[in-house]
Amino acid sequence: MPYIPMPYVVEQTHRGERSYDIYSRLLKDRIIFLGTPVDDDVANVIIAQLLFLESEDPDKDINLYINSPGGSVTSGLAIYDTMQYVKPQVSTICLGQAASMGAFLLAGGAAGKRFAVPNARIMIHQLSGGFQGQATDIEIQAKEALRLKAKLNEIMARHTRQPIERIERDTERDYFMSAGEAKEYGLIDDVFLHKKAAEKKPQ
């Protein structure tokens, strides 16, 4: 994978110039960007950002932009639980794609504040993974996978207001949606072309 240098932003202050990496500068405006697969390291950074922004201002919304193919279920659940835990409402915005755990986090945003741009792609499916080891270990892992699957379906049904039976059926295979279809499904609240359209939504 080619190395992509980190962009930096230089601002003028009364003390002179100050340089920020692009993610730190976005954080100043209460913007968090998830633009990678979800793993433990990514989850820890996003959780830290959520907690920091809560400590900065517990009453002001946080904007989580998502362009992610998904990833680890446990890492995604850690981010999701923190989104529900912090006092500020977390608005979610899909750019590009929100697949698997990316779609789960998109749906987990504050009610009325979940958005996607017109050409975004959203995909839900059941968790996947292979099991190795002795027969007893495989049985334990399979039971845990079924427990997690049921938990994810339950949460998704609650956020989309879809019957859990439909969530179970739709996630048996990769289920792709356009932004408009995701709105009809209840996974997002609106599709917008310009940022100002989202800002007009009631806070």
Curated annotation (Swiss-Prot):
It catalyses: Hydrolysis of proteins to small peptides in the presence of ATP and magnesium. alpha-casein is the usual test substrate. In the absence of ATP, only oligopeptides shorter than five residues are hydrolyzed (such as succinyl-Leu-Tyr-|-NHMec, and Leu-Tyr-Leu-|-Tyr-Trp, in which cleavage of the -Tyr-|-Leu- and -Tyr-|-Trp bonds also occurs). Keywords: Cytoplasm, Hydrolase, Protease, Serine protease. It is found in: Cytoplasm. GO terms for biological process: protein quality control for misfolded or incompletely synthesized proteins. Its main location: cytoplasm. The active site is at 100 (nucleophile), 125. CDD domains: S14_ClpP_2 (cd07017). It comes from the Bacteria. GO terms for molecular function: ATP-dependent peptidase activity; ATPase binding; serine-type endopeptidase activity. NCBIfam families: clpP, PRK00277.1, PRK12553.1. Belongs to the peptidase S14 family. PANTHER family: ATP-DEPENDENT CLP PROTEASE PROTEOLYTIC SUBUNIT. Fourteen ClpP subunits assemble into 2 heptameric rings which stack back to back to give a disk-like structure with a central cavity, resembling the structure of eukaryotic proteasomes. This is ATP-dependent Clp protease proteolytic subunit. It comes from Anaeromyxobacter sp. (strain K). The gene is clpP.
